[in-house]
């Protein structure tokens, strides 16, 4: 079973912000899938995707706890037999750069920190989407909670759409090695 979690903040005022890139990916993913059932549980909007042949269910999750408390929602849904995939923004990657990694520190991302703390482990997949850095450290909060410029937004949408396509493949074949390789080699500034 896959537990695919997009990190973001609920509310219309946040939906187009850089910090909500995890939700952008899930929004695009949902347009590519059929047979999703929506449920509200565990402080989240949860879309279930049932696989009749495999007798499995995958979950696409939008935590409604706000970014810094994402661990509360994930802990409520997570079971050890699940493969957890968390999609989030990354200030240390250039705009549109994508990276997949298994385990490791939160690198200062409070949503990821919350999940690590709640689960008591860092053993899960992270899909990072670069949003770049502001010019000044004092601007970080306003930057992540701000909307990207038009050219930035186009690059981020290309990256989010590519990740959504790769998640569709992962849902089908569970090939994490290929998933990681494809996303790590993607360049959102080129036509792939």
Swiss-Prot record:
Entry keywords, A to Z: Cytoplasm, Hydrolase, RNA-binding, tRNA-binding
Catalytic activities: an N-acyl-L-alpha-aminoacyl-tRNA + H2O = an N-acyl-L-amino acid + a tRNA + H(+)
EC number(s) given by UniProt: 3.1.1.29
Biological process per Gene Ontology, one example term: rescue of stalled ribosome
Residue numbers marked as site, Discriminates between blocked and unblocked aminoacyl-tRNA: 9
Compartment(s) where it occurs, according to its Swiss-Prot or TrEMBL record: Cytoplasm
Residues that coordinate or bind tRNA: 14, 66, 68
Main location per the UniProt record: cytoplasm
UniProt-recorded Gene Ontology molecular function terms: peptidyl-tRNA hydrolase activity; tRNA binding
Site description Stabilizes the basic form of H active site to accept a proton, residues in chain: 89
One family name in Pfam for this protein: Pept_tRNA_hydro
InterPro entries in alphabetical order: Pept_tRNA_hydro, Pept_tRNA_hydro_CS, Pept_tRNA_hydro_sf
Coiled-coil segments: none
Active site: 19 (proton acceptor)
Record-level GO cellular component terms: cytoplasm
Cross-referenced PANTHER family: PEPTIDYL-TRNA HYDROLASE
Protein family: Belongs to the PTH family.
Quaternary structure (record): Monomer.
Functional summary from the UniProt entry: Hydrolyzes ribosome-free peptidyl-tRNAs (with 1 or more amino acids incorporated), which drop off the ribosome during protein synthesis, or as a result of ribosome stalling. Catalyzes the release of premature peptidyl moieties from peptidyl-tRNA molecules trapped in stalled 50S ribosomal subunits, and thus maintains levels of free tRNAs and 50S ribosomes.
Matching NCBIfam families: pth (TIGR00447)
Name of the protein: Peptidyl-tRNA hydrolase
Organism of origin: Coprothermobacter proteolyticus (strain ATCC 35245 / DSM 5265 / OCM 4 / BT)
Gene field: pth
């Amino acid at each position: 079973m896959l537990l695919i979690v997009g990190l973001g903040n609920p509310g219309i005022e946040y939906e187009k912000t850089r910090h909500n890139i995890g939700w952008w990916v899930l929004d695009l993913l949902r347009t590519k899938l059929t047979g999703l059932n929506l449920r509200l549980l565990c402080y989240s909007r949860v879309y279930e995707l049932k696989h009749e042949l495999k007798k499995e269910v995958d979950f696409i999750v939008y935590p409604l706890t706000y970014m810094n408390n994402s661990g509360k929602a994930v802990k409520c849904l997570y079971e050890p037999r699940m493969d957890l995939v968390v999609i989030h923004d990354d200030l240390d990657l250039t705009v549109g750069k994508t990276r997949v990694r298994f385990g490791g520190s939160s690198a200062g991302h409070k949503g990821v920190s919350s999940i690590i703390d709640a689960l008591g482990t860092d053993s899960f997949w992270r899909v990072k989407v670069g949003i770049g850095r502001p010019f000044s450290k004092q601007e970080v909060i306003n930057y992540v909670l701000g909307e990207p410029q038009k050219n930035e937004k186009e690059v981020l949408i290309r990256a989010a759409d590519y990740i959504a396509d790769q998640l569709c493949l992962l849902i089908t074949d569970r090939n994490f090695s290929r998933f990681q390789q494809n996303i790590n080699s993607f360049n959102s500034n080129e036509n792939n």
